[in-house]
A protein has these predicted regions:
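Active-site-proximal helix/loop segments of hydrolytic enzymes
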Residues: 1-198
Length: 198
């Protein structure tokens, strides 16, 4: 991203040091980031569950999404019902729509890349859930689940340097695709404002 898009990249951490979910979002806001991508490896009680999925902030629409959010949010020590800022941040409709767009583009790239690594990779799609790490973000924000560490095949792939590099390239391509889509959206909005057809 830094080299190819001349973008400033801010990592919330570069090692295994724990940084709270809220601090990660605050750091992105402090740096006035254009996008916030939280990268995770998923887990399931059912070891056969595998694949890639991307989330953006909203209420969970499936039991799976609720369970993933509950696991990811456990480090906060709070229950989702105890997060008063959740409803307020979800009502930022413009960020929700932008986050959905980012999630869709990122998911397509992630799935394509993961499928090249392992053709049987499941596309678990774009989902919504109330992730603490996404609450309060002032920019489009998503959580990308790049595989399941509870699945032996996914775990094996995630341990390989070449696999992680490919997934990183897919994340780059997704962010690049999203940034390019912003340009076309701005042109369309400008044309609509001028009264001309897009």
């Amino acid at each position: 991203l830094q080299e190819r898009l001349n973008a400033e990249v801010v990592l919330t951490r570069t090692d295994d040091t724990f940084i709270s979910l809220e601090e990660r979002t605050a750091l992105a806001n402090e740096h006035q980031a254009d996008v916030f991508v939280s990268i995770h490896a998923n887990s399931s009680r059912i070891r056969s569950v595998s694949g890639v999925e991307t989330y953006y902030l909203n209420f969970a629409t499936t039991l799976d999404a609720q369970e993933v959010a509950a696991r990811e949010n456990v480090s906060t020590g709070r229950n989702i019902r105890e997060l008063p800022d959740l409803v307020k941040s979800i009502t930022k409709a413009d960020k929700s729509a932008e986050s959905r767009e980012l999630a869709n583009i990122l998911q397509k790239r992630l799935y394509r890349s993961a499928q090249r690594l392992f053709p049987e990779t499941k596309n678990r799609g774009v989902r919504t859930a109330p992730f603490v790490v996404l609450i309060g973000a002032d920019m489009p924000s998503v959580l990308a689940e790049v595989g399941f560490v509870s699945n032996p095949r996914d775990e094996k792939l995630l341990k390989r340097v070449d696999s992680r590099k490919r997934l990183a390239e897919a994340l780059y391509a997704g962010i690049e695709g999203y940034m390019k889509s912003l340009g076309s959206m701005e042109v369309q909005a400008s044309n609509r404002a001028k009264g001309s057809a897009p």
